[in-house]
Amino acid sequence: VDPAILRAAQRLKAFSRRAFLGGVTASSLLAADMFVTREVQRQRRQTVVLEVADDAARRRFPDASWILFPGYKTSWEEARIILSSLRGSLADRGQLATVGYSNLGLDIDEILDALRVHVRQKRLRTLYFYGHSFGGMVATEVAARLLSQDGVQVKVIVLDSSPASKFDVLDQAWFDSVVHLYEIGVRIPSIVRGGYEFGERVINKHERTWGEIVDQTLEQLSPLAPSSVLIQSESEYIYQWDATRFGDAMGTARMAFIGNPSDTTVSYPSARARWERYFGRNLVSSDLQTIGAFPPHASPQWSGIVYNQVLGRLLPQLLPLPRPTGGAGGGAA
C-alpha cells in the first residue's frame, strides 16, 4: 500500500475523531443553552418579587422594604441594576426588592398576590414604593388597592419621570398603534419588534455608537428581555390608566415626583402638573429635577450619582431619619 495513502487515511481518521468530538461538544452546548433558555422563559411566565441582597439593610430594617415597580420594557436584570444604583440612598431606610412582571402580560392582580406573599414571608410591616417611569402608575394603583382590600398603608411612593396620563407620553403614534393591535388580539412578532427597536435607537442615537445600537436592539430580543406580549400589555395599561380613580384613595401615603425638563419620552411639565392636580393632598414634593442624568428619562441605572444626590435631598422630606439620642455618657441611639 502506498505510504502516502496510509498517511492520508490516518489524517482523515484523526480529523473525523476531532470533528465528531467537536460536534458532540457543540451539540451539548446548544442543548444546554436551549434548556437554560426554556427554563428562563418558563420562570418568567409568572409575576414575582425579587430581592436585592443587602445584609446590612436586612439587619437594620427587618420589617421595612422598598419595592421597585420597573418601567416600560425593563427586564428583571435591569430592575436589579436600578436598585443597586440607588442602594446608597434607599438602603438607609429599608430592604430592597423589585417586582418582576410576567412575560404573559402585565396583571395587577398577580402583582398584588406576589406582593402579599412577599410581605407575609418576610414579615414586613412598612412598605415604600419606587415607581420607575410608567411603574409609578402601577405603584399608585397597587398602593390604593392594598389600602382598600387589605388595610395596608404604603408609606411612601417616589414617582421617577412617571406619566400621570397617556397624554403625557410624547410618542403618541407608536403608542396608539401598539395598543390598538393588542386590543384586537394581534401580537407583534419578534422580527417586527426588532425592526422597531432598531429604528427607535437610530432616531434617538445621541452619543451611542452603531455597535451599541445593535447590541441594545439584540438585548431587547434575548430570552432575558420582556416579551412582546408584556410590552404591548404595558402600553395598554398606560393608555387606559385614569388618575381620577386613585386621587382620593391613597390614604396617608407621602408621594413625590422627580423628573427632567429635557425628557424626550414623557412630557415633564405635563406629567408634573397632572400629579400635582390629582394627588395634591399626598404630594409632598414635585420640584426636584434629575438634571444631568443621561438619558434624561428615568435612568438611575445610568446616572446613579445624579439620582442619589436628588434622593439625598428628597428622602429627608419623605422619611426623616430618627435623630440619635444620648450623649458621650451613653444612651439609646
Regions found by a protein language model. Name each.
Residues 1-15:
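N-terminal secretory signal peptides
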Residues 15-25:
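N-terminal export leaders
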Residues 42-90:
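Short, surface-exposed "cap/lid" segments of acyl-processing enzymes
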Residues 87-105:
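Conserved alpha/beta-hydrolase
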Residues 131-139:
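Gly/Ala-rich beta-loop-alpha elbow adjacent to hydrolase catalytic centers
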Residues 158-169:
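Active-site nucleophile loop of the alpha/beta-hydrolase fold
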Residues 204-286:
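Serine-hydrolase catalytic core
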Residues 287-333:
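Catalytic active-site module of serine/aspartate enzymes centered on a nucleophile-bearing elbow/loop
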